[in-house]
Design a protein with these regions (language model features):
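C-terminal outer-membrane beta-barrel translocator/porin domains of Gram-negative envelope proteins
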Residues: 8, 12-165, 169-170
């Protein structure tokens, strides 16, 4: 299995959620202490011609977070793929798709507010981190599903003599 990478990880975390008097009912009902033991893994298939500044190929990753011991029992599934194609004169077009979903495994139970999903800054430009998506009152609470489609075009001919400058349009 050439260019196929399996990355497992086990993590244990303790979390204490506290709220204020003006918190919403959804926040207040999730107040308390939580202990999670999780098994995370990713499976990556890399067909790029180079891991650093690729010009051709793609990299595809499936990821999952499975609760081993948890008071919330939520599972995260995700998939991302990014492709690269040289257009002309060392200009490289990249297109990437990023998706994730979190699902509560307990019947009629919401996903814990601290486990909700937010798009990473690298996937969503022009917005404050954590300030996009569903709101509960004045608070951004993240979502159970997320997806982004990103494109970028590298233009190395703008600074041909500078080795340490990257320029991309996205």
């Amino acid at each position: 299995f050439e260019n196929l990478y399996f990355s497992p990880m086990i993590s244990v975390a303790h979390e204490s959620l506290t709220t204020t008097a003006n918190a919403s009912a959804n926040y207040k009902k999730q107040e308390g202490s939580y202990l999670d033991a999780l098994f995370n893994y990713s499976l990556t298939y890399d067909q790029r011609n180079s891991p650093y500044r690729p010009t051709e190929g793609y990299v595809s990753t499936i990821l999952q977070e499975i609760p081993l011991v948890s008071e919330g029992y939520s599972i995260i599934n995700g998939y991302q793929i990014k492709g690269y194609k040289e257009i002309v004169n060392d200009s490289v077009l990249s297109v990437g798709l990023y998706t994730q979903a979190i699902t509560s495994l307990k019947t009629n139970t919401d996903v814990r507010v601290s486990k909700r999903l937010f798009l990473p800054e690298s996937k969503l430009r022009g917005f404050k981190s954590g300030k996009v998506g569903p709101k509960d009152g004045a608070d951004y609470v993240g979502g159970n599903y997320m997806a982004s489609l990103n494109t970028a075009l590298s233009l190395p001919f703008l600074f041909p003599t500078l080795d340490k400058v990257d320029f991309a349009v996205f």
